[in-house]
Amino acid sequence: MADMLTIAGKTFSSRLFIGTGKFASPEIMRDVLQACKSQMVTVALRRVNLADPEDDIMSQIDTGETNFLPNTSGARNAEEAIRLAELARAGSGTNWVKIEVVPDPRTLLPDPIETLKATEELVKRGFIVLPYMNVDPILALRLQDVGAAAVMPLAAPIGTNLGITNRLQLEMIIEQARVPVVIDAGLGAPSHAALAMELGADAVLVNTAIAVADKPVAMAEAFAMATIAGRAAYLAGLGSQCPVASASSPVSGNITVDLDFLD
């Protein structure tokens, strides 16, 4: 049976989600989506005109193959995020939304209090909410409690390409999760995506590492393969780590060789 990802009753065969913020052109974004076969693409509402079917970005997204996930990038508080989500639903008809509430342009870290407020209110309004969050196991539980369809903890600050910087707390979030965990932001290399999947994450979201690569399409393919490999390793069951050596060959029944002839 195929290993499918399910979020809010919708199934996906690809566990690689793609962000659209930094591509040099909409055409490169389109080629990346086709190459990596991603089925979830997130778009900042402030960058698109949902009322225009010829919009540069939206016209390159095959919504028959790819789930459109609008995000509230630019929102500084819950009120602004809620307003953007409602605009997205009115303009596109989708009730899916990725909540991003980022008040500080220097750190670009999500506001936990406002994110929780926005998530709770939008769930009440019938939205399928995927909140972007810090690596905070308690916040992850609270977001699940108020109805988040998935949680999206960052690997590292957005755009840094640093990879997983807080593995312990990320593992806590994954271990206690009742909804899918999507690692979002800071994944800078395919190996980072593979590690996230090996740890038990349900999916990863990547933008910068692909968009700024010398060959974005080739990098997208590399991330897709890494995501598949990491997931396969997790399902296979990774061996436990040990601080001391353990022989892989038998240590009993050794052959004794007489080297006296060398004298």
Swiss-Prot record:
Extract the PANTHER family matched here: THIAZOLE SYNTHASE (PTHR34266:SF2)
Pfam families reported in the protein's UniProt record: ThiG
Q: Give residues annotated as binding 1-deoxy-D-xylulose 5-phosphate.
A: 159, 185-186, 207-208
Task: Name the EC number(s).
Answer: 2.8.1.10
> Where does this protein come from, organism-wise?
Desulfotalea psychrophila (strain LSv54 / DSM 12343)
Tell me, in one coarse class, where this protein mainly resides: cytoplasm
Q: Which pathway does UniProt place it in?
A: Cofactor biosynthesis; thiamine diphosphate biosynthesis
Encoded by which gene? thiG
Where found, per UniProt?
Cytoplasm
SUPFAM superfamilies noted in UniProt: ThiG-like (SSF110399)
Per the entry, what this protein does is: Catalyzes the rearrangement of 1-deoxy-D-xylulose 5-phosphate (DXP) to produce the thiazole phosphate moiety of thiamine. Sulfur is provided by the thiocarboxylate moiety of the carrier protein ThiS. In vitro, sulfur can be provided by H(2)S.
**Self-association or partners: how does it assemble?**
Homotetramer. Forms heterodimers with either ThiH or ThiS.
What is the protein's name according to its record? Thiazole synthase
GO annotations of cellular component type: cytoplasm
Which family does this protein fall into? Belongs to the ThiG family.
InterPro entries, A to Z: Aldolase_TIM (IPR013785), Thiazole_synthase_ThiG (IPR033983), ThiG (IPR008867)
Keyword Transmembrane included in the entry's annotation: no
One Gene Ontology biological process: thiamine diphosphate biosynthetic process
> Active-site residues?
98 (schiff-base intermediate with dxp)
Extract the HAMAP family matched here.
ThiG
**Catalysed conversion reaction:** [ThiS sulfur-carrier protein]-C-terminal-Gly-aminoethanethioate + 2-iminoacetate + 1-deoxy-D-xylulose 5-phosphate = [ThiS sulfur-carrier protein]-C-terminal Gly-Gly + 2-[(2R,5Z)-2-carboxy-4-methylthiazol-5(2H)-ylidene]ethyl phosphate + 2 H2O + H(+)
Query: Which keywords fit this entry according to its UniProt record?
Result: Cytoplasm, Schiff base, Thiamine biosynthesis, Transferase
Q: Which GO terms describe its molecular function?
A: thiazole synthase activity
